[in-house]
Regions:
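Adenosyl-5′-phosphate
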Residues: 49-283
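Active-site adenylate/phosphate-handling loop in enzymes that bind or generate adenylated species
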Residues: 1-48, 116, 135-159
Length: 283
């Protein structure tokens, strides 16, 4: 499978986004530079006809903080940080004063501050996301559950070391991601594949979980009794969110993010922590 190729050859949109934001930051008042962001997110409907002001609202967070070692991911992590607004009072109190970005900054490798913006972004994506989440939840765990052994040629340490030695322009050339790989594959696979725009796999969220024919478990996972029993989220805040989504035609990216977090957290709670498993936990 292709795990690792996006990380080591700069295939993810977040890499292009970081470079465009850095370019934009050199002239933050420009109305043209932010328009480049529309090229990399054609799949997000509300950005297709967005004005420079709308783009600044979505992508302008800490735009000029280019010296920050976590610059590439600051916007994404700020968006996901909105989930904390829906935490219960007890959870808010338990995380009060903890800054995960400060914690991560203290664990960066030697010389990290001198790396290029792209190299920093690749390290963060590989270390935080791929190693800590992607390979287990979407790779090995899914494969092993179905008696399939995944093979990951792009994760061969020799391939990783080679790609790490490449100049940035051979990985991300302008907004052309996986540049060297595409050049090498030209003539070996059809041009329609080589030149095909990158298409993220996006699952529907609110349109499924809040539909009339939604899965049976959803009502239970979003119920006030489950929210109060698990104690992670605020029942009032979640109820307000659900009401807002149901009144809207479509949910925002952040609303979908919160909805997914609530349902996923409660499924984990039900599976591993609920009272019916208390005997196992105590054994």
């Amino acid at each position: 499978t292709g795990e690792g190729s996006d990380e080591i050859l700069a295939g993810y949109d977040i890499f292009r986004e970081a470079m465009i934001r850095q370019f934009w930051a050199k002239q933050p008042g420009s109305s043209l530079r932010p328009m480049l962001l529309k090229r990399i997110y054609p799949d997000i409907p509300h950005l297709r006809n967005a004005s420079p002001n709308i783009l600044k609202m979505f992508f302008g967070y800490r735009l000029e903080d280019t010296g920050n070692p976590l610059y590439s991911h600051l916007l994404r992590w700020n968006n996901s940080n909105h989930i904390k607004k829906h935490f219960s009072d007890s959870i808010k109190a338990s995380v009060n004063g903890y800054d995960p970005l400060e914690d991560l900054s203290g664990k960066l490798p030697s010389g990290f501050y001198n790396w290029s913006t792209l190299a920093k972004a690749q390290w963060l994506e590989t270390t935080v996301f791929m190693s800590g989440y992607l390979l287990s939840s979407q790779g090995d765990r899914m494969g092993m559950a179905n008696s399939i052994e995944g093979r990951y040629p792009f994760l061969d340490y020799r391939v990783i070391e080679f790609c790490s030695s490449l100049p940035d322009r051979l990985k991300l050339n302008g907004t052309d991601e996986k540049y060297l790989l595409k050049k090498l594959m030209a003539g070996r696979i059809p041009d329609s594949i080589v030149k095909r725009p990158k298409q993220p796999y996006r699952a529907p969220i609110s349109s499924v979980f809040l539909a009339k024919d939604k899965p049976d478990y959803v009502n239970e996972m979003l119920s006030e009794s489950m929210i109060r029993k698990a104690g992670v989220f605020s029942a009032e805040s979640v109820a307000s969110l659900l009401e807002k989504i149901q009144k809207s035609v479509t949910a925002s990216e952040m609303e979908n993010m919160v909805l997914t977090s609530v349902i996923s957290t409660h499924l984990l709670y039900h599976q591993f922590i609920d009272d019916q498993n208390q005997d196992l936990l105590n054994s």
